[in-house]
Structures are given as C-alpha cells and as structure tokens.
UniProtKB/Swiss-Prot annotation:
Highest taxon, organism lineage: Eukaryota
Pfam families given in the database record: PBP_GOBP (PF01395)
GO molecular function annotation: pheromone binding
Family: Belongs to the PBP/GOBP family.
One BP annotation, GO: social behavior
Positions in coiled-coil regions: none
Single GO cellular component term: extracellular space
Described purpose of this protein according to its UniProt entry: Colony queen number, a major feature of social organization, is associated with worker genotype for Gp-9. Colonies are headed by either a single reproductive queen (monogyne form) or multiple queens (polygyne form). Differences in worker Gp-9 genotypes between social forms may cause differences in workers' abilities to recognize queens and regulate their numbers.
UniProt protein name: Pheromone-binding protein Gp-9
Subunit structure: Homodimer.
Organism from which the protein derives: Solenopsis tridens
Listed CDD domains: PBP_GOBP (cd23992)
Disulphide bond pairs: 37-77, 73-129, 118-138
Claim: Secreted is one of the keywords in the record: yes
Length: 153
C-alpha cells in the first residue's frame, strides 16, 4: 500500500512539474518560425512573454503597451509564415484545421468552440500585432480554464 501511495505521489509531482515547465515556456517557442520572427522584429527570447503569464492575463498588467505590441508582432509573424494569417486577416478554416491537428481536438470539443469565440472576438481588430496577441491570449486563457474545470471534474 505504501508503494502505491508513493507512486501516486510521484505521478502527481511529475504532472505538476510538467505543467509548471509548460507555463514557463515562451509563447510560440514550439513553432518552426519562432527564431526567424524574433530576429525579424529585433527581439530576443527574454522579450517574449511566458505561456503562464499570458494564460493568466498577467502580461496585460506587468508590461508596457510597446512590449505587448512587440510580442503580438512576433505572434502575427509566425501565424503569417504558417499561412494562418495574411496581414490582419485570419484564414479561419486553416486556423481550425491546424488547431485540431495540433491539439487532437474532436468535433464538439470545447477547445474548438473557444478558438471560434476568440477568432470572433478579435476578427474586427485592425492592428495585426495587437489582434494576434489578443487571439493567442484568449485561446491560452480558455485552454487554462478548460483544463482547470476538467481536473476538478
């Protein structure tokens, strides 16, 4: 019995460490064009917000507007290079397809509904950089809420 409890404790510790590690990652850092877009915008990885900071909304209160805009420009650059965005316009269908491929979400999945809501919320924004960061922040926040609600279930 003690061994079983120890295994459960270790599993919980590993799961917590993994979630913490993911939240410390920089937004967009897992994508191919990350370094290219950083260079194109004259930024370093230190300039980019962490996933945890963005999913919790702390990026809005902890940073100046220029930092928000620069992070958004890097996000827009990656979205554009991946064919998901052209200027300030989304390719909504391609964005859904890529999101499903990346997350493994199935039809009816609340994550897809969240993505759709985030695209709808930001679609009329004209500044491509601000629009991109707000979209990414919206999706990350929704994923965090959905993850929390599924853990509590």
């Amino acid at each position: 019995m003690k061994t079983f409890v120890l295994h459960i404790f270790i599993f919980a510790l590993v799961a917590f460490a993994s979630a913490s590690r993911d939240s410390a990652k920089k937004i967009g850092s897992q994508y191919d064009n990350y370094e290219t877009c950083l260079t194109e915008h004259g930024l370093t990885e230190d300039d980019i917000f962490s996933i945890g900071e963005v999913s919790s909304g702390q990026h809005k209160t902890n940073h100046e507007d220029t930092e928000l805009h620069k992070n958004g420009c890097v996000m827009q650059c990656m979205l554009e290079k991946d064919g998901l965005m052209s200027g300030a316009d989304y390719d909504e269908e391609k964005m859904r397809e890529d999101y499903i491929k990346e997350t493994g979400a199935q039809p009816g999945d609340q994550r897809i509904e969240a993505l759709n809501a985030c695209m709808q919320e930001t679609k009329d924004m004209e500044d491509k950089c601000d629009k991109s960061l707000i979209l990414v922040a919206c999706v990350l926040a929704a994923e965090a809420v959905l993850a929390d609600s599924s853990e509590g279930a």
